[in-house]
Amino acid sequence: MPYVDRQNRICGFLDIEDNENSGKFLRRYFILDTQANCLLWYMDNPQNLAVGAGAVGSLQLTYISKVSIATPKQKPKTPFCFVINALSQRYFLQANDQKDLKDWVEALNQASKITVPKAGTVPLATEVLKNLTAPPTLEKKPQVAYKTEIIGGVVVQTPISQNGGDGQEGCEPGTHAFLRRSQSYIPTSGCRPSTGPPLIKSGYCVKQGNVRKSWKRRFFALDDFTICYFKCEQDREPLRTIPLKDVLKTHECLVKSGDLLMRDNLFEIITTSRTFYVQADSPEDMHSWIEGIGAAVQALKCHPREPSFSRSISLTRPGSSTLTSAPNSILSRRRPPAEEKRGLCKAPSVASSWQPWTPVPQAEEKPLSVEHAPEDSLFMPNPGESTATGVLASSRVRHRSEPQHPKEKPFVFNLDDENIRTSDV
């Protein structure tokens, strides 16, 4: 979508055919400067390029004879395509959509319209002479190939010396792949599978770094709970995730200073810990991001809810209620079969059965002997049995504040007693 910048120039992204009838389109950033009487295109937005990086192509507006929509016969497989006729040469360009196509055609026709000067104006001849001598120098710029590197977070372009035409052909596919990857209007449904909530909005924006304050192009994705940005559209793991519950305000950045002063379509996302400065490609894109983030934050405040995957995480969290609700069933599953069978056959006498807590006896109290013990004491475990069943009843051992006294008789039961049970023998 073309927009007007601070210098009253029409700017925007278009795809231009590399060579006529080649069918190979490259992504470029176009600037229609009516004051300089030329149409320039760059590798990217000049604000994002290194200092001194010039245009990769240019065309004088006085050489343009006609701008029209390409017919299906000219470009049958290229939608939203229009052609610029200039100096017996045709430039085929592809827009993003139908409205973008119409706006560019009208702007170029309006800028290249021939105006008849008033009588007695001599500077027109000198202007024409300047225009005639300028194109040869401008046309030499696209012949220079650059190698783009990121050194210390700064984009550096180094000219490459070429021996013949093979070097240019070899480096063009890499540049072409990089440019196609930076498109902001390609849908994301086919590249990265959505594992979380559905996306509300996604696209490329330019973000300011936190440490070096450098500007880098990142792929942003907004859903119902977070806003994430990735290094490229194909990445699965985001570089950073901003929870919407931490977003305090999102609005257009009107008060600018320093590096922010030259940034168009700039908005800021204010959170509790940091302010993010993000630059969109057009004013419409900027307002769309602001409205989308604001609506998502408002919806989260009015109807607070958790992501759908939080329930599955809480099930595996240690110490959760689902694990502690049935400790006996989990422990019983982990017992060996032999020990479990032994515990079942001696259920009346094992220490794992429920017993109330016994308080600490006073110093003057005399401990009960085995002969005078009450009848319930017969169900207490023997000294030998307490060690055998200690593994099973480690979590439910009855509290004893005083060690047991040694027994006079090794066998506490009377075999002549008629009330003795066979399970205790």
From Swiss-Prot:
GO terms for molecular function: fibronectin binding; laminin binding; lipid binding; PDZ domain binding; phosphatidylinositol-3,4-bisphosphate binding. It holds the Pfam family PH. Binds specifically to phosphatidylinositol 3,4-diphosphate (PtdIns3,4P2), but not to other phosphoinositides. May recruit other proteins to the plasma membrane. It is found in: Cytoplasm; Cell membrane; Nucleus. Residues 310-425 are annotated as: Disordered. Residues 363-375, 400-410 have a biased composition (Basic and acidic residues). There is a cross-link at residue 141 (Glycyl lysine isopeptide (Lys-Gly) (interchain with G-Cter in SUMO2)). Keywords: Cell membrane, Cytoplasm, Isopeptide bond, Lipid-binding, Membrane, Nucleus, Phosphoprotein, Repeat, Ubl conjugation. Its main location: cytoplasm. It comes from the Eukaryota. Residues 7-113, 198-298 form the PH domain. This is Pleckstrin homology domain-containing family A member 2. Residues 310-331 have a biased composition (Polar residues). PROSITE patterns: PH_DOMAIN (PS50003). GO terms for cellular component: cytoplasm; nucleus; plasma membrane; protein-containing complex. It is a peripheral membrane protein. The keyword Repeat applies. InterPro entries: PH-like_dom_sf, PH_domain, PI-Interact_SigTrans_Reg. The modification Phosphoserine is found at residues 184, 314, 349.
